[in-house]
Amino acid sequence: MLPTIGGEHASRILFLIIEFFDVAEEGENKNVRGLSYIAENSNDTIAVGTTDSIAIPLNTNRNTTKYQFIRNTNNPNIRNADTIEFIYEVNEVYVNRACGFKAVYKDLSAIRSIETPASNNWIRSVSIEKLNVENEQNTHVNIDH
């Protein structure tokens, strides 16, 4: 494979790294069965499968991205969708002459939509682990379920 001009940052969007945890066992990763997600105003559902972490893109043209996270996607009897809106500032950071600039996200926050009754939500809490999304080596958001 040929190297890319600009190295690892060329033609690349930084992804938000999310880990899923067991709400009953603090600090214990917990798989989400049949996970998929869809961005607001999109018709493309991304099927992930069973996992305890995902990487999702944030919109660089706006300061907010809203996703619907769906568990048990393939079972209509127990399918459950929750919505989280991520809010941030988009800043451009100079990488080098070959690559130019890349987008980083600052002051990340999240708003979880609460259903009525709240027990209908499969996502119990969302916590921001890194306020700034500058790389993909660290988890940025924890979701307890």
What would you call each of these model-derived segments?
Residues 1-10, 57-145:
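Extracytoplasmic cysteine-anchoring/structural motifs
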